[in-house]
């Protein structure tokens, strides 16, 4: 088998077009080779106006190779913030999902906190603070807890009573309910503890004198069972110069973020 040489047909117009294109390709290639020589000024113009388009420019705004100078730093920072914005948009819904609290429907439910019932009584010779909370055990019973903290002279009684309890001054205040009311009201004292400390300090009404003070801290726990509608908190306070009887009937079915405040 013989190989025959093919005749070369030269078209002047086509030859001139190929020659011009090859010249521009060589010129652009020289511009890219010159990029490694750190030439100022000419590098940016050659890359922008060249007909050769890098495939990476179809997806990224600038060449992935870092270039010295302020323009390269600005371009890299711009791409960094774009990437960070895209990552933030993706991760933000996931973060919100993680931060969503898990609601547990357990057996025990805390209805109120220590600040839900707050009573502060101040006189010349006594400073009294009473706080309370209610815990629903979920089995038809709930507990009522009280804490008393008093400084000075006086007697304090805090108890649970039915709404029919008459507010009146009694000769000897009792901290427990009567037998008939206990049976119909279904509430009883479960735990009670009182700590007392005696001390002397300067009198509030006359700092030049020394007065006898008694500091009392007590904890009382009531246990109630259903059926019940409304229970009331009954406070009886007796001192040498001041007497107070107060009945509070909060609505335990209404969960309010603002606690009940009573001051006298």
From Swiss-Prot:
Residues 179-264 are annotated as: V (Cys-rich). Belongs to the neurexophilin family. It is found in: Secreted. Residues 1-22 form the signal peptide. Residues 91-169 are annotated as: III. Glycans are attached at residues 86, 139, 149, 155. Keywords: Glycoprotein, Secreted, Signal. This is Neurexophilin-2. Residues 23-90 are annotated as: II. It comes from Homo sapiens (Human). One of its GO terms (cellular component) is extracellular region. GO terms for molecular function: signaling receptor binding. Expressed in brain and kidney. One of its GO terms (biological process) is neuropeptide signaling pathway. May be signaling molecules that resemble neuropeptides and that act by binding to alpha-neurexins and possibly other receptors. May be proteolytically processed at the boundary between the N-terminal non-conserved and the central conserved domain in neuron-like cells. Residues 170-178 are annotated as: IV (linker domain). The gene is NXPH2.
């Amino acid at each position: 088998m013989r190989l025959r040489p093919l005749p070369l047909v030269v078209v002047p117009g086509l030859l001139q077009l190929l020659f011009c294109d090859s010249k521009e390709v060589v010129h652009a290639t020289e511009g890219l080779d010159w990029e490694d020589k750190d030439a100022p000024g000419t590098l940016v113009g050659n890359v922008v106006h060249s007909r050769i388009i890098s495939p990476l420019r179809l997806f990224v705004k600038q060449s992935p190779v870092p270039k010295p100078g302020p323009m390269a730093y600005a371009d890299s920072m711009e791409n960094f913030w774009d990437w960070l914005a895209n990552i933030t948009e993706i991760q933000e819904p996931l973060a919100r999902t993680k931060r969503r609290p898990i609601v547990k429907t357990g057996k025990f439910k805390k209805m109120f906190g220590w600040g839900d019932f707050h009573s502060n009584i101040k006189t010349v010779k006594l400073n009294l603070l009473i706080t309370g909370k209610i815990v629903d055990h979920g089995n038809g019973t709930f507990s009522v807890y009280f804490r008393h903290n008093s400084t000075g002279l006086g007697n304090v009684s805090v108890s649970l009573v039915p709404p029919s309890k008459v507010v009146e001054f009694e000769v000897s205040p009792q901290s427990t309910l009567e037998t008939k009311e206990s049976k119909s009201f279904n509430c009883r004292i479960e735990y009670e503890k009182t700590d007392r400390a005696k001390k002397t300090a300067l009198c509030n009404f006359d700092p030049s004198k020394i007065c006898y003070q008694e500091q009392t801290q007590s904890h009382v726990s009531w246990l109630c069972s259903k059926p019940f509608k409304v229970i009331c908190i009954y406070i009886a306070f007796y001192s040498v110069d001041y007497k107070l009887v107060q009945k509070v009937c909060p609505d335990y079915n209404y969960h309010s973020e603002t606690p009940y405040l009573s001051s006298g």
